[in-house]
Amino acid sequence: MEPVPLQDFVRALDPASLPRVLRVCSGVYFEGSIYEISGNECCLSTGDLIKVTQVRLQKVVCENPKTSQTMELAPNFQGYFTPLNTPQSYETLEELVSATTQSSKQLPTCFMSTHRIVTEGRVVTEDQLLMLEAVVMHLGIRSARCVLGMEGQQVILHLPLSQKGPFWTWEPSAPRTLLQVLQDPALKDLVLTCPTLPWHSLILRPQYEIQAIMHMRRTIVKIPSTLEVDVEDVTASSRHVHFIKPLLLSEVLAWEGPFPLSMEILEVPEGRPIFLSPWVGSLQKGQRLCVYGLASPPWRVLASSKGRKVPRHFLVSGGYQGKLRRRPREFPTAYDLLGAFQPGRPLRVVATKDCEGEREENPEFTSLAVGDRLEVLGPGQAHGAQGSDVDVLVCQRLSDQAGEDEEEECKEEAESPERVLLPFHFPGSFVEEMSDSRRYSLADLTAQFSLPCEVKVVAKDTSHPTDPLTSFLGLRLEEKITEPFLVVSLDSEPGMCFEIPPRWLDLTVVKAKGQPDLPEGSLPIATVEELTDTFYYRLRKLPACEIQAPPPRPPKNQGLSKQRRHSSEGGVKSSQVLGLQQHARLPKPKAKTLPEFIKDGSSTYSKIPAHRKGHRPAKPQRQDLDDDEHDYEEILEQFQKTI
């Protein structure tokens, strides 16, 4: 087949003959775009092979042959078209008459001229229909007697047979739809007429979208038929050609098999690496991989080392076989205690630094000393100094005495425990009180305890000869991440497998020839991968890793005069806890531990709770208000009356 313009090939194409393989004979390139414009291919090189799978009509451009004006018609245009001429044209009237008399057609016949004709004082415009009735002698010249219809009247014209055209014969035919006209090769580029359009004559120029397959293209290529390129049909000689289709690992992940698969890397995504493992450097173009399928289990744990100035971060597979031992957790604020609290599981902590309570805000916001033992009961609310509710963590103070001589005092404290209210912003420092020496697997640990938690690896994973987790004094297991991974090995090193997350390392690959062998026994998979700092913080931004919102800022301290004015006006509200969640029930105290308040705010006295043995005393307060205090309040009352 000789090369033809792409537009001509598509118009003459029979859809039933698809697919067809084409070779580009003359390439085209649009400057400013490498691959496509508006989703359509615009760059084809000479020699490219195209496998056309579907042709779709996009629109039809309707052109006025007289003025060259254009308009667009939708493929579902409902108008009807009639051809104004036939594919055969005649240069003179004599040729037209000769062809008509020699054929089975008889006179009269209708025709039109593509040029204006001036004769006998009249002008016949182009595309105006004339009816040739007979050939006669007129003024000694052999002429064609024609009838011209004008404004309901018929005018007889005598045109010499030597009159030059070109001329087109016209035959009445049944109106056709837009698709019927486009599917008839005999009507290609003919002048048509349509009563629903404003122009008497028009030419239809369809535009198609070609859907094709090309080498090394992941998706179907869309090519406009108006692309100025010549093509050649090579279907007969190219039936054996296999078009290579690249894949992404994320697409391989969606497959159900069969595995293993042999793949070759075509492209590695740009950007900083996510793992610090040796195999990352081997992921280059041309490297062959063996994909064994979906990794199991699908969850991972994000862990960070402790005990070093610069922490290291790891992604630990759920299949990790090392043994872990719990370590006490550290909590810098009361808000962190709330995040670790779980109903039904006692959480006991020990204060590791002295901290003064904000007794001006609430008398029950007690101070803590090093060694104070607390049991977390749950969240609640308490009255603040300004009458607003303050979010607090309700705790119970535990005894730190264990002698036999003090058993009675311990029993008394057990019957009447001291309640401690810690605002969420309380800047204390706590460490978890625990005595758990069991050795857990990673799966058991995450199932029984909430994250984050502190652990120590006491036995390495035997399937990981260079397990790095055993070298740290402690690990902080931060979050559990559920993400599908693919088990992969290098074709050059099938003995060691690793897991790739297609979501974050989506390689472009292509299926390679051959079927890899499945190794005997279980696959040796690296269950610990060290992360780069950049990727670690990227993981921490995931919805599954979102850290709880920071605690509210502490309330601003009021001035002394403002506090006293507030006290004199309405009195200090009771610091009784307003609300506790159902899971944090408080023990009923035997005696009242809160000071009583008199209606008159001017004579309010706050009593300091009795200091218990082993507890750091709270900041001393004046219990007996002197006369100056009363004088001050009297002056204030007089001042208010004066105002």
Curated annotation (Swiss-Prot):
Modification sites for Phosphothreonine: T593
Protein modification: Phosphorylation at Tyr-632 is induced by LPS. Phosphorylated by Src kinases (Lck or Fyn) following BCR engagement.
Disulfides per UniProt: none
Comp. bias regions, Basic residues: 609-619
Record GO biological process: cell adhesion; inflammatory response; regulation of B cell activation; T cell receptor signaling pathway
Induction: By contact to a reconstituted basement membrane.
GO-annotated cellular components: cytoplasm; nucleus
Cited InterPro entries: CABIT_dom (IPR025946), THEMIS (IPR039671)
Subcellular location: Nucleus; Cytoplasm
Task performed by this protein: May constitute a control point in macrophage inflammatory response, promoting LPS-induced TLR4-mediated TNF production. Determines the threshold for activation of B cells by low-affinity and low-avidity ligands via PLCG2 activation and its downstream pathways.
Family stated for the protein in its record: Belongs to the themis family.
Subunit structure: Interacts with VAV1. Interacts with LAT. Interacts constitutively with GRB2, LYN and PLCG2; these interactions increase the activation of PLCG2 and its downstream pathways following B cell receptor stimulation.
Name of the protein this chain belongs to: Protein THEMIS2
Organism: Homo sapiens (Human)
The organism's taxonomic lineage, starting at the top: Eukaryota, Metazoa, Chordata, Craniata, Vertebrata
